[in-house]
Amino acid sequence: LFLGITFNYGLILGWTSVTNQINVIPILLYVGAIFWTLGYDTIYGYQDIKDDEIIGLKSTSIKFKENPKTFLKVCYLIFFTILLSVGILMKLNFIYYIFLLMVILHLYNFQIKRLNIEKQLSCLNIFKSNNLLGLIIFIGLIIGKQNF
């Protein structure tokens, strides 16, 4: 949670520096990104969960190791719902929603369904895929603002 709160604060800073104002949209994006980060950081944590347990670390990977996919579904559903809300509030065009479809398909089909917390490489590959996912969201937001 702390990583998501600190890491994603740049959303609000970037938004305000470009628009010179603050409104509900960057705050929604910030909250959504926190839940996205909670998800992918939990996946990342499964790579070395045994070491974390030995040293007594308190992490979402340890807390939800018995049912990680349920936790990820909740995090990613909140993230997706916020992205959907942002699209509506910003009056983005239909192409944004096509990009959102790619986002939810990736989160569910690639990340949640394929996750095997017993295999480090599975966790690493899924974690790294979030880089591409961020690009898809960014492009969707840019194209979604265009008038066709």
Q: How should each PLM-predicted stretch be described?
A:
Residues 1-148:
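Multi-pass alpha-helical membrane architecture of UbiA-family
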